[in-house]
A protein has these predicted regions:
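A short, hydrophobic beta-strand element within the central beta-sheet of small alpha/beta folds
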Residues: 79-90
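Alpha4 helix (beta4-alpha4-beta5 surface) of REC/receiver domains from two-component response regulators
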Residues: 88-105, 111, 115
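CheY-like receiver
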Residues: 25, 71, 75, 111, ...
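Short, structured coil segments at secondary-structure junctions
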Residues: 26, 78, 97-100
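Conserved phosphotransfer microenvironments
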Residues: 40-42, 55-74, 79
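Two-component/phosphorelay signaling modules centered on CheY-like receiver
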Residues: 13-35
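Acidic, metal-coordinating helix/loop segments flanking the phosphotransfer/catalytic sites
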Residues: 32-54
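Acidic di-acidic motifs
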Residues: 10-12, 106
Length: 120
């Protein structure tokens, strides 16, 4: 089975590792970016991050909103599918629609996440 690369922007290393472990057996390779700093987000322009099929973004990355990160990425021309992961926040549905973001609750259902990725 060919692995599908996705990016996960998440400041909690344990959450990122759990996400990676949950998807690895389902043919998904998670490329972790640990913060929303410009130097880190620059990785999205470099292989293998640049060719990843989708980007998963935590709702809060330190003090930065995942929606702000998504908005910046869209304004920078990134057209890949975005998924916003949150443990309880209720993101603005209009903002999700405007930025073309799929909203997912934590903890993630890895079977559903892998199916959504495979359908891309």
């Amino acid at each position: 089975m060919t692995e599908i690369d996705v990016v996960y922007i998440e400041d909690d290393d344990i959450e990122a590792e759990l996400f990676s472990l949950g998807l690895s057996s389902r043919g998904v390779n998670v490329l972790h970016i640990p913060d929303a700093e410009p130097n880190s987000l620059h990785l999205l322009q470099i292989a293998p991050y640049a060719t990843a099929r989708a980007i998963f973004i935590d709702f809060w990355i330190g003090v930065v909103s995942g929606l702000d990160v998504a908005k910046w990425l869209r304004e920078s021309g990134d057209t890949r599918p975005f998924f916003l992961l949150t443990a309880g926040e209720n993101p603005d549905p209009n903002m999700l629609k405007q930025l073309n973001i799929t909203y997912l609750q934590k903890p993630a259902n890895y079977n559903k996440v892998a199916s959504a990725i495979s359908a891309l």
